[in-house]
């Protein structure tokens, strides 16, 4: 599951203080709400975020625990299209869905060219 946004580190740090020092693209194996997890400091939203990998049998417990602990911080579930909008706003493009499959300067003389999104 993915925990993205400006309060993600504060929420996780309540249970795992060392998460504050996790480098971008870093991984750590630890325990979260009493369950074994692997946490990566990754995401595709342009915000600080984490992805939490767990056993299937632990997913519901972790989901409920994260939402409960984060309720007063504004943490709430969102659908994938919300994450997709953040990704596009941060110019993290998904090829070829967000841009052309052709190079915009093919067969064009030097000069003003508008990039497409």
Tell what function each PLM region has:
Residues 1-117:
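Conserved, structured C-terminal
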């Amino acid at each position: 599951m993915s925990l993205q946004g400006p309060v993600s580190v504060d929420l996780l740090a309540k249970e795992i203080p060392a998460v504050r020092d996790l480098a971008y693209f870093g991984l750590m194996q630890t325990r979260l709400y009493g369950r074994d997890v692997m946490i990566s400091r990754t995401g595709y939203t342009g915000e600080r975020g984490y992805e939490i990998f767990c056993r299937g049998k632990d997913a519901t417990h972790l989901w409920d625990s994260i939402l409960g602990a984060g309720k007063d911080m504004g943490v709430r579930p969102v659908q994938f299209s919300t994450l997709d909008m953040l990704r596009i706003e941060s110019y993290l493009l998904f090829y070829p869905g967000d841009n052309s499959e052709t190079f915009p300067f093919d067969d064009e003389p030097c000069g003003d060219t508008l990039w497409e999104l």
